[in-house]
From Swiss-Prot:
This is 5'-AMP-activated protein kinase subunit gamma-3. Phosphorylated by ULK1; leading to negatively regulate AMPK activity and suggesting the existence of a regulatory feedback loop between ULK1 and AMPK. AMPK is a heterotrimer of an alpha catalytic subunit (PRKAA1 or PRKAA2), a beta (PRKAB1 or PRKAB2) and a gamma non-catalytic subunits (PRKAG1, PRKAG2 or PRKAG3). Interacts with FNIP1 and FNIP2. AMP 1 binds at residues 240-245, 285, 306-307. The keyword Lipid biosynthesis applies.
Amino acid sequence: MEPELEHTLPGTLTWSHSGGPESQEMDFLEQGENSWPSPAVATSSERTCAIRGVKASRWTRQEAVEEAEPPGLGEGAQSRPAAESTRQEATFPKATPLAQAVPLAEAETSPTGWDLLLPDCAASAGGSSTGDLELTIEFPAPEAWDCELEGLGKDRPRPGPSPQAPLLGLSWDDELQKPGAQVYMHFMQEHTCYDAMATSSKLVIFDTTLEIKKAFFAMVANGVRAAPLWDSKKQSFVGMLTITDFILVLHRYYRSPLVQIYEIEEHKIETWREIYLQGCFKPLVSISPNDSLFEAVYALIKNRIHRLPVLDPVSGTVLYILTHKRLLKFLHIFGALLPRPSFLCRTIQDLGIGTFRDLAVVLETAPVLTALDIFVDRRVSALPVVNESGQVVGLYSRFDVIHLAAQQTYNHLDMSVGEALRQRTLCLEGVLSCQPHESLGEVIDRIAREQVHRLVLVDETQHLLGVVSLSDILQALVLSPAGIDALSA
């Protein structure tokens, strides 16, 4: 008998939302009113502000927040239950404890010392409210997705011209020394992964005895890009099945003349992992709901993964899967309640946030197989598609590759990347981009509003200059103020 696609785990979840009115958290992805649980309520039902001594009321679209100090800035580090290790856990470096941050009420300077929003920066503050975000469902149309996965490889071809990097300023270190530059770092240290979890969401789990072909088709049918793998023999989660695995299947098939595609398709997931990925896959990296969002950001960027399972510390059950996009959206929504750092008004070119050199690109005339080679070798999640003049004409992501399975066209990897983009069910008009003169605040607002994972940095003639990704932004807002560079580690 074939195992079910959605594996039901024994046991009862120990983490659940209480039924009281103070804890009925509206999931913004499932509810039409775009409501989130207030982080102040999620971590402490009542929070006394350091300045005026008033309570912050529950925050939704229908309720206004009373004027108060931003949550998490006026008190010491919160005591939380220690996270129990259920899988491999990342080692997190020492960051500035929240208790060492100077409370606003005790500072000798006035509130203007936090570098609040200047009048000339008011335009970049637009779109910071939840009303500007199109927050609908957890899994939007697959064609609008970009892949967020990892990959492995050897040889990389060199398609496309080498883009010119903009002249970068050296002011980012100076900005981090200004008062208020650590406000987002403290916010993410103060709140836990439980705060960012949805009240209700879809979670697809595969048993390792499932055939790999059926698993990939199930991912397409359910609109997911990754699924936890359950080993019934070990009675534990052993990893994640991602689109990277599908890319590796195609890559091995095309690069090995003696291997037939149907032979790989009929393999079980456990066979694929043991034979074809021998020595390549790593133990599952997970996190506890008690751990801070700061640790979640570090684990995602440090391990170069795009899915971080939240495991129950007692039962080991997967409760939720955190992503870069979920964390930035959480920070973007509640960041409107925090003092606005001055660096949000600085331009991308001045701050140097993003990737500007040694960019992975692909020519629109190159075959899809060339794009697969770059995905495997460079471990990137998307490739800017350029023409012979170096102008950006599209964006080919890892998730576009799995469309080959949905359309039964994965035997035709010799088609051009441009043709593959035109065959997508959903044809996107243009490429979401930004320019060097735009401020960091404007870029963050656009990424959150459009629900994308990156913006392509171009000049006035649409020539490629760089890429600004979610990892770049989270590194700058959360980890850099703590003196941590997880991107280069």
